[in-house]
A protein has these predicted regions:
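Core catalytic alpha/beta fold that binds nucleotide/phospho-ligands
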Residues: 1-5, 9-170
Length: 170
């Protein structure tokens, strides 16, 4: 895999119904830190829905589903960096899968409206970095070849002009 992309959308009302019907749902699906974060918000269900969408999006970016090959929902955790930006922390089978695929990073984007939460995740791999460097090298090589050709054309032009001057006796 060069780059994996995952997108998921969750209806907030549906998340609310699931959490009301199954009180143990949050403990099975979200880490303690995720639950503490969501529960600290004015509208916890919105944040639970965004994190659920993130877990699904990350698994899609890794090329698998949740609950596949022993992966648990809590193996994908949404944490916040020092600036408050949501990022991904992988554990267990999710971390093993990412390592096997050479995943270096999984940038994450979360957003929501009054009715839905959406997450987008991109699994950036070693192969994608190598490909980017290769493309950069190709561009540099083409630029160098262009300069060399331009120099040859300039030389040819001045040589041709000099020969023309000789022929016309100047």
């Amino acid at each position: 895999m060069t780059v994996g992309l995952g997108v998921d959308i969750v209806e907030i009302a549906r998340m609310r119904r699931v959490m009301e019907r199954t009180p143990s749902f949050a403990a099975k699906v979200f880490t303690e830190a995720e639950r503490a974060y969501c529960d600290s918000k004015a509208n916890p269900t919105t944040h639970y829905a965004a994190r659920f969408a993130a877990k699904e999006a990350v698994c899609k970016a890794l090329g698998t589903g949740i609950l596949v090959d022993g992966m648990r929902m809590t193996d994908v955790e949404v944490v916040r960096d020092s600036r408050g930006k949501p990022t991904v922390a992988l554990h267990g089978q999710a971390a093993a899968r990412a390592k096997d695929q050479g995943v270096l990073d999984i940038p994450l984007s979360l957003t929501y409206t009054h009715s839905v939460a959406v997450a987008n995740a991109v699994a950036i791999t070693e192969a994608s970095q190598v490909e980017r460097e290769r493309r950069r090298d190709v561009k540099a090589e083409l630029a160098q070849q262009f300069k060399e050709m331009r120099g040859m054309l300039d030389d040819l032009s001045s040589t041709t002009a000099h020969k023309a001057d000789e022929i016309h006796g100047q």
